[in-house]
Amino acid sequence: MAYADWLRRDHRFSDILVQVSPAPCGHAFPRLKLRYKPSLVQLEGGSCHLPLVESSMRASPLTPSEWREKLEARKRLESEPAGDTSGRNVLLLDVRNGYEWDIGHFEGAKRPNVDCFRSTSFGLSEQEMDSSDPLHGVDKENTDILMYCTGGIRCDVYSTILRKKGFGNLYTLKGGVSNYLTSEGCAEWVGNLFVFDDRLSLPPAKFAEEGEREDAAQEQGGIDTGRSSPSRWLGRCYVCGSEVEELKHRNCASIDCNRLFLCCRWCLEELRGCCCLECRSAPRLRPLLPGHQRYDKWHLYRDATSSTLHISS
């Protein structure tokens, strides 16, 4: 946290949101890497041409409590008779990858048909019929679009694209899902949250630990914090479709595939850590690792295999 404290001493970053979550099995980021990147997030065509620094072109940020109110209002709207058109249309848009949705998402959010954020094209389709685009045919002026992602950065960037396409009512969750789970607990959320580090997946309770300590102090004063208990979400095996015991992805053992997927124990053993039969017979295979360990660099497995073959011969 020393770096965060140093950063906040600069008046330009005094109000920056720093999010902290626990790493049960050791430090999730043991090394600090500083790299120059032309773009914070990767998009087809780059992002240099986007008006990212113009706040009016980005989605309007909602605090976690405001976001929760929007979701609850959306639920009430959906429960009204079909002929009642007095309320505004509300669309919940998950601006993440499909595999992230698979282990957890806000109730009512459709699974994004995206495997890499770079290829996201919501609201950009020119086809008359495009069932894969959740924004296709949406009334741009009379629909509130609620965008969310893990930490909020992808939404900030992508909302400028949608704004340029004429979508007028864009809202994003400030600080993303991780900030929401810390503040509001599991309300309206099901499952775990995918994270891009060795932890892979975190249950909402891990994010809410700090928030719960704050709640305990409030409850002593008789304040109802409104936290909800977690809703159970059943992930499905990518291979056979059965329920999985743990909401954590693994990479395909084939280095040339490397797909992130959920897998049941039976398929895991049957395919030796691969996502399909084709990958099972691929030439460059890594060993099946116990639990949800992450693979190391390919050369370590390649060299180990070469050494074994040399000794055998």
Model-derived segments and spans:
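Rhodanese-like catalytic fold shared by cysteine-dependent sulfurtransferases
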Residues: 1-60, 65-79, 88-90, 97-146, ...
